[in-house]
């Protein structure tokens, strides 16, 4: 597989990645939000002054409250599931108790899926099964070889393709996702109906780099379908992008964030006015400070204070 295809992005991914990053930073708050630089920059404001203003402005995180309130309401009563003939199956019980091979139950994993869908508008769930040399189901049970699920947020699903079946139903016939990424390389996984391939791509984020794309592993797709489900929060008008619960709240939070900055500026400047003086006038800051001026200083050069009125 050539590097150009492995580093390609779907047009809808390019159109929505900025919003997705804005939503997740708005939900996380703290340094993640501050590092997004969502304060409006003043004209002629230096980078140092802008960074200082960011440090002094608190974040009132409404986005996290919205997502957690919805999640708490939906999961207030645990879901009831009917497994039919599979009820009591050892592999099913193992999956329900540890759905992601990381010790989290199926309910816990699906709660996270719902939260991510609320933040981004949609969330991807991929089902996989470890490769093994076992020949019987008894050996699989003994070694706990079974399917598990992985969660992928929309930033990591970089390319896809839908096709319409003869029945009229749309189905995935290609899915490209980024499993891991750093400054030097990325691990990319390509799903098709025929195979599942894993590649290591050097200099993945450099658009015109000549880094190597090396195949790590390629296994047949035994089910002939891409084992991925797109979980929507609300369906959008373009598949597979959903509508986030934060589509409006995030911008409201940004507005409040900027209002807090303006209030902080107003209070600080009102309480600490600016002193205008000539270079030869000695003055110190602080309450009760003394200003020494030369005896022969002209009257029109005497120090004076600039202070905002605070009336808006």
What spans do the regions from the language model cover?
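Intrinsically disordered, low-complexity, compositionally biased regions/tails
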Residues: 33-34, 40, 88, 92, ...
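Intrinsic disorder/low-complexity signature
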Residues: 11, 32, 48, 57-58, ...
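General helical secondary-structure elements
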Residues: 21, 37, 49-51, 60, ...
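Intrinsically disordered, low-complexity segments enriched in small/polar residues
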Residues: 27-28, 34, 82, 86, ...
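A broad, structure-centric signal for solvent-exposed, well-ordered loop/edge residues
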Residues: 46, 66, 81-84, 134, ...
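Extended, helix-rich architectural segments
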Residues: 1-152, 156
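Extended, regular secondary-structure scaffolds
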Residues: 111-239
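Extended, charged amphipathic alpha-helical segments
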Residues: 210-312
């Amino acid at each position: 597989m050539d590097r150009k295809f492995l580093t390609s992005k779907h047009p809808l991914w390019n159109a929505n990645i900025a919003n997705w990053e804005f939503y997740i930073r708005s939900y996380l708050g703290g340094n993640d939000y501050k590092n997004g630089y969502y304060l409006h920059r003043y004209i002629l404001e230096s980078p140092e002054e802008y960074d200082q203003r960011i440090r002094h402005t608190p974040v009132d995180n409404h986005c996290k409250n919205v997502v957690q309130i919805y999640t708490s309401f939906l999961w207030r009563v645990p879901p009831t599931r009917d497994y039919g003939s599979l009820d009591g199956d050892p592999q099913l019980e193992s999956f329900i108790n540890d759905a992601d091979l990381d010790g989290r139950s199926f309910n816990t994993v699906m709660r996270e899926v719902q939260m991510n869908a609320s933040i981004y508008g949609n969330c991807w769930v991929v089902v996989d099964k470890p490769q093994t040399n076992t020949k019987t189901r008894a050996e699989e049970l003994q070694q706990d070889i079974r399917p598990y699920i992985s969660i992928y947020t929309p930033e990591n699903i970089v390319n896809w393709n839908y096709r319409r079946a003869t029945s009229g139903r749309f189905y995935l016939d290609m899915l490209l996702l980024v499993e891991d990424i750093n400054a030097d390389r990325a691990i990319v996984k390509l799903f098709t109906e025929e195979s599942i391939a894993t590649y290591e791509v050097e200099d993945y984020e450099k658009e015109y780099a000549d880094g190597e794309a090396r195949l790590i592993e390629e296994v047949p797709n035994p089910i002939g379908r891409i084992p991925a489900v797109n979980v929507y929060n609300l369906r959008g008008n373009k598949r597979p992008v959903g509508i986030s619960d934060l589509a409006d709240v995030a911008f409201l939070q940004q507005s409040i964030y900027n209002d807090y900055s303006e209030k902080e500026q107003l209070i600080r400047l009102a309480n600490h006015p600016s002193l205008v003086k000539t270079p030869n006038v000695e003055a110190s800051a602080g309450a009760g400070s003394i200003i020494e001026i030369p005896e022969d200083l002209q009257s029109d050069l005497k120090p004076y204070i600039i202070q905002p009125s605070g009336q808006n």
